[in-house]
Structure formats: structure tokens, C-alpha cells
Amino acid sequence: LIQGDVGSGKTIVALLIIADVIKSGFQVVLMAPTEILANQHFDYFNKLLSPLNIKTEMLTGKTKNKKDNYARLKKKKIDILIGTHSVYNSSIEFYKLGLIVIDEQHKFGVRQRINLLEKSAGCHTLIMSATPIPRSLSFVMYGEISISNIKSKPQGRKEVVTSLINKNQIETLIEGIERKLIKNEQIFWILPTIGTLDSEEQTLITRYEYLKKRFKNKVGFIHGKVNKEDAERVMQDFKDQKIMILVSTTVIEVGINIPNATLMIIENVERFGLAQLHQLRGRVTRGNLQSNCVLIY
């Protein structure tokens, strides 16, 4: 178990371990809880490892030509398989699986992890989380899992400043957003439900429409029901700063890396768990700029 706070560098540690395992002639599978995070990992690993002739492939529920990928895995034409829950499909056979990496381990159930472990007897397992589940910590206590703690963050990172406001103070918050936009900094605005325009409570759709009227085409949205192509386009536009305010559900909770995002707004905060809040707040500690997290109740 690699335990380290959000933004502490768990992914780069995993990448170095993975490269060493592949150098020894084995394959690696990395499982992430969401397609957005799996996509991000694929881009990151492919960029750094392809110059070393390490072949990375992605597999999710929406991947086309799955059978072709299965055949390539069995013939060891794929070194790293990155994906969501699809990677423990019973149809998948590895040539020589040496390491299983489970990112954001607290997001997966016990049976899901066991299914993956059954793919290769004696396979090493690396699990990563800023908020490990009690079951994993109990395994650490009894010596069944070794633990490595990353106790510091990369040099230059600043602590996020967290504040709590009432929903009646939204206008004051909007003024703060305008100041952030003047400095060309980006904003996440998180809500617990998607909703509709007719929703009585504040939901993703109603808040998006409100912000769209104020900030025009600087606002985008994403949630779990957005199709893969649109989700990838929105996230790329956010990375490219074509979108400056991203309204979202917790689909961006884990792993998303946008160094220019410095403000995290979480509305209806009483509807979220502590681990969720900690993960969400970690989305704005990715660069060297001062970041803020505003909780609205």
C-alpha cells in the first residue's frame, strides 16, 4: 500500500515500479475507478514510457475491438493494460502478469480486487490511496500488506485554504470567481446531483445554467451520463483553458490533474462524505499557485 495525500506523487512512484517490472519481462495491469482517470493515466504513461518502447493500451467498457486487445495481451504485445472495471473481465488472459496496480483503492470492492488477483498466481499487488479503507489498514496492522507512506508533497506546493459559507453568500463568491478569471485561473464547481431544469433544489444543470448566463462560453459541465467522446472533449477543453469553469458531479473526484485550477467549490456540502471532500479538495493542489476550497451549505 502506497499511502500519500492527494497530489503527493503516488502516480510517479507507481510508474517507476511499473517500468522496473516490465524491464524484468512481466506485464502490468493498472485499474482506475473512472474512465476520466483511466484516460489521464493512459496519456501520462504513454507519453513517458513509449520512448522506452513500452507498449501501453487502454480498456474500458466503451473500448472498441476488445477481442483484438485480448489477443495482443495473450501474445505479450501489450506491456501495460490501463482500464476501469473492464480489466477483470473473465475473457482476459495475460502472457505473464507480474504486477497489479489499483489506483484509488478505496473506490473498489473486495470481490473486484480478488477477481483481478486470480488472473495470476503469485502476482505482486500495488494499491494506492490517500484515504485507505479500514479493511486495508487492518491488513497492514496484521502484516498482510506492507505500507509505504509519502509524507511530503513536491516542493513549492501550497496548502489549500478551506472556508465554509452559506448559500445566501453566492454573489460574494461570484465576485471571487471573477477575480480568479482575471488572473486566468480555473475553477471546479461540484454538486451531488445532475437534476433537471425543473429541479427545486440546486443541481448540476440548474447551477450550470446560472453560471452560463454570467460567464457565457467560459463554462462547461461533465457528469457520469455524458458520453465518452463529449466527456473527453470537455476535459481536453478544460486542460487547454478553453473552458475556465467546470461544473461537475463527483466524477472528477479522483486523480484529475489540472495544475491551473485554483478554486474548488462544493455545493450542498452536507451531501458528501469526508473522504469525498478530501479527494475533491485535492483537485486544486496540483500547481504552485495558492488554492482555495469553498464549501457551501
Report each predicted region and the residues it spans.
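Inter-lobe coupling/hinge segments of SF2-like helicase ATPases
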Residues: 1-297
